[in-house]
Amino acid sequence: MKTEKITVNELFSGIGAQISALERLGIPFEIKHTSDIDHNAVLAYASIHCGLTEELINTYAEYPTREEMARQLTEINLGYDFQKNKPYNWYRFVNSKSKELEKYWLANKLSRNLGDISKLEHLDYADFWTYSFPCQSVSVSGKQEGIIKGKTRSGLLYEVQRLLEKADKMLALPKYLMLENVKNLVGKKFKPQFDEWVAWLDELGYNTYWKVLNAKDYGVPQNRERVFVISVRKDIDDGKFEFPQPFDNGVRLKDALEDKVDEKYYLSEDIQNRLIITDKTLTKNVIGTTKPSFRTIGRRDSVYSENSIMGTLVATDYKQPKQILETNRCVKVGDLNYYPYETSNRIYSKEGISPTLTTMQGGNTEPKIAEPIVAVIEPDVKSFRVRKLTPKECYRLMGFTDEQFDRSQAFSSDSQLYKQAGNSIVVDVLYYIFGKLFEVDTETRKEIEC
């Protein structure tokens, strides 16, 4: 095991998935700098990793003037709105009774956030740079404008290139680089640009290894395919790096669900009555129906398991969860004929794998699951309630602990928590990748930590 301290520059840092993985591995590290303009993500990062609390905000004694705090946050483009192409107005808090300026300024200071990467002249040396740039312009769910310098969010990759070129001139190239992005980055449309990037890294002095990995193969019940790119400086590379082998530890969506959920996360009866059973691949054991006055469940309302594997959410016997766990797939049990977007209407079984989490931010776009309830009139019959995943469950599905979630929740709304989770990287996948990169034993941990 390599035990020497690793210094890190965490670009596009989000809520700190990378350092969460390093912490979990027990690797000593020091964050030199982070870089992000999402002010709410910076707030979450500082609360999760840097000890930011309401008490600290109220007792901290070294704040500059409010005018100076507003100037500093504006200068680094914290909170900049790229859709509207306008900076965040920090000056509106100068005469406010609230401590909004103090809160965000202190979060920025504690997380050592440099803000807008395009405004940076250079980065201090660090052994390890992470640079998981925005995916909006290459994602299949986006406009796919591409990686265009100065014009698209994904074009910020070229700011990383500029900073690496500056580091090269300063004889301060990092030993390791890590990039995570959507699978489409290595798809047909964008693979030529990706190959150009890898070739450029080769010329700069790096050997690069990349692979598409799915979170469901690394201990987290979420079907999330992402490309991971590891670059190692040639003068230290022994050529032995390999990506971790996939495994199935049996963890499923139900293992990440909360025991008790606030009623606000359940869909209304009117919407639930629009449920349409659609998974015709299932072959045995009914798992749901929306008919309010049924006495027996008809065949047309039935949902069955695939490939002769028995379904788990069964009307007459709910003690068969492992029978559908074997499918290791995202089990869609039905559709809601209600929302304008097809993916928002999907209903998933909690015995399967979660769909990929996106930035969501509420608005009924959160993944929805079916839960069994016992009918009062006929105790031997079960129906289903449909609800959204909670923010805590989304954090769990990204590999964050409940303690980390609680720290973030202290400063974040539900919509921000959904966004933070969807924007992040699955910690468990990073855990196993970094274990290989830094030669740390990962065999003792094979299950999700909630």
Q: Can you say where each PLM-predicted feature lies in the sequence?
A:
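Core alpha/beta nucleotide-donor-binding catalytic domains of modification enzymes
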Residues: 2-173, 183-188, 192-195, 202
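A structural signal for short, well-ordered beta-strand segments and their strand-loop junctions
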Residues: 130, 178-179, 209-212
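Alpha/beta-hydrolase-fold catalytic nucleophile elbow
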Residues: 132, 180, 230
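Short beta-strands and strand-loop turn motifs
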Residues: 176-182, 411
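Short strand-loop junctions, especially beta-strand C-caps/beta-turns
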Residues: 181-184, 216
